[in-house]
Regions:
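Eukaryote-skewed repeat-based solenoidal scaffolds used as protein-protein interaction platforms
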Residues: 44-50, 56-57, 69-213
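Non-catalytic, usually N-terminal nucleic-acid engagement modules in DNA/RNA processing proteins
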Residues: 10-77, 97, 175
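C-terminal accessory extensions appended to soluble enzyme cores
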Residues: 1-31, 194-216
Length: 216
Protein backbone atom coordinates (compact mmCIF):
# COMPACT_ATOMS: atom_id res chain seq x y z
CA UNK A 1 0.00 0.00 0.00
CA UNK A 2 1.49 3.32 -1.08
CA UNK A 3 1.24 6.61 0.75
CA UNK A 4 -0.98 7.91 -2.00
CA UNK A 5 -3.44 5.03 -1.61
CA UNK A 6 -4.22 5.86 2.01
CA UNK A 7 -7.52 7.69 2.32
CA UNK A 8 -8.49 9.69 5.36
CA UNK A 9 -11.21 8.46 7.66
CA UNK A 10 -12.28 9.42 11.15
CA UNK A 11 -10.36 6.68 12.94
CA UNK A 12 -7.60 5.86 10.45
CA UNK A 13 -8.54 2.20 10.32
CA UNK A 14 -7.18 1.93 6.77
CA UNK A 15 -3.53 2.64 7.60
CA UNK A 16 -2.62 -1.04 7.42
CA UNK A 17 -2.61 -4.29 9.33
CA UNK A 18 -0.17 -4.29 12.23
CA UNK A 19 0.95 -6.75 14.89
CA UNK A 20 -1.27 -6.08 17.90
CA UNK A 21 -0.54 -6.21 21.62
CA UNK A 22 -2.67 -6.43 24.74
CA UNK A 23 -6.37 -6.61 25.46
CA UNK A 24 -7.17 -3.53 23.39
CA UNK A 25 -5.28 -4.43 20.23
CA UNK A 26 -2.57 -1.77 20.39
CA UNK A 27 -0.29 -1.71 17.32
CA UNK A 28 3.16 -2.99 18.23
CA UNK A 29 6.13 -0.69 17.62
CA UNK A 30 9.55 -2.00 16.66
CA UNK A 31 12.60 -1.12 18.79
CA UNK A 32 14.66 1.82 17.58
CA UNK A 33 18.27 2.53 18.50
CA UNK A 34 19.51 6.11 18.46
CA UNK A 35 23.03 6.20 19.82
CA UNK A 36 23.84 9.76 18.84
CA UNK A 37 22.48 12.88 20.49
CA UNK A 38 20.52 15.03 18.05
CA UNK A 39 18.62 18.28 18.28
CA UNK A 40 14.88 17.91 18.77
CA UNK A 41 12.36 20.46 17.56
CA UNK A 42 8.66 20.58 18.36
CA UNK A 43 6.32 19.55 15.59
CA UNK A 44 4.64 22.94 15.22
CA UNK A 45 8.04 24.42 14.26
CA UNK A 46 9.05 21.59 11.95
CA UNK A 47 7.31 22.80 8.80
CA UNK A 48 9.63 25.76 8.38
CA UNK A 49 12.85 23.78 8.89
CA UNK A 50 15.09 23.36 5.85
CA UNK A 51 17.88 21.17 7.30
CA UNK A 52 15.59 18.33 8.29
CA UNK A 53 17.97 15.42 7.80
CA UNK A 54 19.90 16.21 11.01
CA UNK A 55 16.93 17.05 13.26
CA UNK A 56 14.38 15.10 15.28
CA UNK A 57 10.73 15.99 15.79
CA UNK A 58 8.91 15.65 19.13
CA UNK A 59 5.26 16.04 20.08
CA UNK A 60 5.57 17.10 23.72
CA UNK A 61 3.24 20.02 23.06
CA UNK A 62 -0.49 20.63 23.37
CA UNK A 63 -2.52 18.09 21.41
CA UNK A 64 -4.27 20.65 19.23
CA UNK A 65 -0.90 21.67 17.77
CA UNK A 66 -0.37 18.28 16.13
CA UNK A 67 -3.87 16.92 15.44
CA UNK A 68 -3.15 17.45 11.74
CA UNK A 69 -0.89 14.37 11.72
CA UNK A 70 -3.95 12.33 12.70
CA UNK A 71 -6.35 14.10 10.37
CA UNK A 72 -4.07 13.81 7.32
CA UNK A 73 -1.78 10.83 8.01
CA UNK A 74 -0.45 10.18 4.51
CA UNK A 75 0.65 13.76 3.95
CA UNK A 76 2.51 14.02 7.24
CA UNK A 77 4.08 10.58 7.06
CA UNK A 78 5.77 11.70 3.86
CA UNK A 79 6.80 14.98 5.47
CA UNK A 80 8.19 13.38 8.64
CA UNK A 81 10.23 10.88 6.67
CA UNK A 82 12.60 13.70 5.74
CA UNK A 83 13.78 14.08 9.37
CA UNK A 84 16.53 12.18 11.18
CA UNK A 85 14.05 10.74 13.69
CA UNK A 86 10.52 11.34 14.94
CA UNK A 87 8.81 10.57 18.24
CA UNK A 88 5.33 9.09 18.36
CA UNK A 89 2.62 11.73 18.91
CA UNK A 90 2.08 12.31 22.61
CA UNK A 91 -1.72 12.29 22.78
CA UNK A 92 -2.57 13.19 26.37
CA UNK A 93 -3.30 10.57 29.04
CA UNK A 94 -4.32 12.93 31.82
CA UNK A 95 -5.40 11.14 34.99
CA UNK A 96 -8.74 12.98 34.99
CA UNK A 97 -9.60 11.79 31.46
CA UNK A 98 -12.08 8.94 31.19
CA UNK A 99 -10.45 5.55 30.76
CA UNK A 100 -12.02 5.24 27.30
CA UNK A 101 -10.35 8.46 26.11
CA UNK A 102 -7.00 7.44 27.61
CA UNK A 103 -7.00 4.07 25.85
CA UNK A 104 -8.13 5.62 22.57
CA UNK A 105 -5.30 8.17 22.75
CA UNK A 106 -2.80 5.40 23.46
CA UNK A 107 -4.15 3.37 20.54
CA UNK A 108 -3.98 6.19 18.02
CA UNK A 109 -0.45 7.09 19.10
CA UNK A 110 0.53 3.56 18.15
CA UNK A 111 -1.62 3.45 15.03
CA UNK A 112 0.35 6.38 13.66
CA UNK A 113 3.67 5.16 15.06
CA UNK A 114 3.37 1.73 13.44
CA UNK A 115 2.28 3.38 10.19
CA UNK A 116 5.27 5.72 10.24
CA UNK A 117 7.68 2.89 10.92
CA UNK A 118 6.27 0.92 8.00
CA UNK A 119 6.99 3.82 5.66
CA UNK A 120 10.56 4.26 6.75
CA UNK A 121 10.23 6.96 9.39
CA UNK A 122 12.70 6.39 12.24
CA UNK A 123 10.05 6.44 14.94
CA UNK A 124 10.98 6.53 18.62
CA UNK A 125 8.30 5.54 21.13
CA UNK A 126 7.18 8.33 23.45
CA UNK A 127 5.99 6.53 26.57
CA UNK A 128 3.35 7.94 28.90
CA UNK A 129 0.96 6.76 31.58
CA UNK A 130 -1.83 8.09 33.78
CA UNK A 131 -2.25 6.35 37.13
CA UNK A 132 -1.44 2.88 38.44
CA UNK A 133 -4.56 1.43 36.83
CA UNK A 134 -3.24 2.52 33.43
CA UNK A 135 -0.29 0.14 33.75
CA UNK A 136 -2.67 -2.60 32.56
CA UNK A 137 -2.52 -1.19 29.02
CA UNK A 138 -0.29 1.92 28.71
CA UNK A 139 2.86 -0.11 27.98
CA UNK A 140 1.14 -2.36 25.44
CA UNK A 141 2.74 -1.99 22.03
CA UNK A 142 5.92 -0.39 23.36
CA UNK A 143 9.12 -2.24 22.38
CA UNK A 144 11.60 -3.61 24.89
CA UNK A 145 15.26 -2.61 24.84
CA UNK A 146 14.63 0.43 22.65
CA UNK A 147 15.46 4.09 22.82
CA UNK A 148 12.33 5.74 24.22
CA UNK A 149 11.23 9.27 25.09
CA UNK A 150 9.39 10.68 28.11
CA UNK A 151 8.39 14.12 29.33
CA UNK A 152 7.97 15.28 32.92
CA UNK A 153 6.59 18.68 31.87
CA UNK A 154 3.55 19.55 33.96
CA UNK A 155 3.99 16.63 36.37
CA UNK A 156 6.14 18.34 39.00
CA UNK A 157 3.51 20.88 40.08
CA UNK A 158 2.34 19.04 43.17
CA UNK A 159 3.18 16.02 45.30
CA UNK A 160 0.50 13.75 43.84
CA UNK A 161 1.29 14.33 40.16
CA UNK A 162 5.01 14.04 40.88
CA UNK A 163 4.47 10.69 42.55
CA UNK A 164 2.33 9.44 39.65
CA UNK A 165 5.11 10.33 37.22
CA UNK A 166 7.89 8.70 39.24
CA UNK A 167 5.90 5.52 39.89
CA UNK A 168 5.04 5.19 36.20
CA UNK A 169 8.62 5.88 35.19
CA UNK A 170 9.89 3.11 37.45
CA UNK A 171 7.28 0.73 36.04
CA UNK A 172 8.44 1.63 32.54
CA UNK A 173 12.04 0.75 33.43
CA UNK A 174 10.95 -2.65 34.73
CA UNK A 175 8.69 -3.53 31.81
CA UNK A 176 10.54 -2.07 28.84
CA UNK A 177 14.18 -2.01 30.02
CA UNK A 178 14.98 0.82 27.58
CA UNK A 179 18.55 1.21 26.38
CA UNK A 180 18.22 5.00 26.47
CA UNK A 181 15.61 7.47 27.72
CA UNK A 182 15.37 10.81 25.93
CA UNK A 183 14.03 12.89 28.80
CA UNK A 184 12.33 16.27 28.39
CA UNK A 185 11.82 18.40 31.49
CA UNK A 186 13.05 18.21 35.07
CA UNK A 187 14.58 14.86 36.02
CA UNK A 188 13.63 13.80 39.57
CA UNK A 189 16.39 12.19 41.59
CA UNK A 190 14.29 9.03 41.78
CA UNK A 191 14.45 8.49 38.00
CA UNK A 192 17.23 6.16 36.90
CA UNK A 193 18.37 4.60 33.66
CA UNK A 194 20.49 5.83 30.78
CA UNK A 195 19.00 9.32 30.56
CA UNK A 196 19.72 11.84 27.83
CA UNK A 197 18.29 15.10 29.15
CA UNK A 198 16.73 17.82 27.00
CA UNK A 199 15.19 21.12 28.03
CA UNK A 200 11.40 21.32 27.65
CA UNK A 201 10.05 23.21 24.66
CA UNK A 202 9.01 26.29 26.63
CA UNK A 203 12.61 26.85 27.80
CA UNK A 204 13.99 26.60 24.28
CA UNK A 205 11.20 28.88 23.08
CA UNK A 206 12.16 31.49 25.69
CA UNK A 207 15.78 31.34 24.52
CA UNK A 208 14.67 31.74 20.90
CA UNK A 209 12.67 34.85 21.78
CA UNK A 210 15.59 36.34 23.71
CA UNK A 211 17.99 35.68 20.83
CA UNK A 212 15.55 37.18 18.33
CA UNK A 213 15.15 40.32 20.44
CA UNK A 214 18.93 40.64 20.78
CA UNK A 215 19.38 40.39 17.00
CA UNK A 216 16.92 43.23 16.46
Amino acid sequence: MSLESVKRNGHNLDLGQFELAGEYGIPQLQPVHLDERIQWIRFNHALKEQTRECLGVHFFIDDYLFLRVWNDPARYALFLRSFKAVMTPDFSLFADYSRAVQIYNHWRKHQLGAYWQRFGVKTIPSVSWADRDSYAWCFDGEPEGSTVAVSSVGTMKNKDSRRLFIDGYREMLIRLQPEKIIFFGDVPDECGGNIEHHAPYYETFTKELAFSAKER
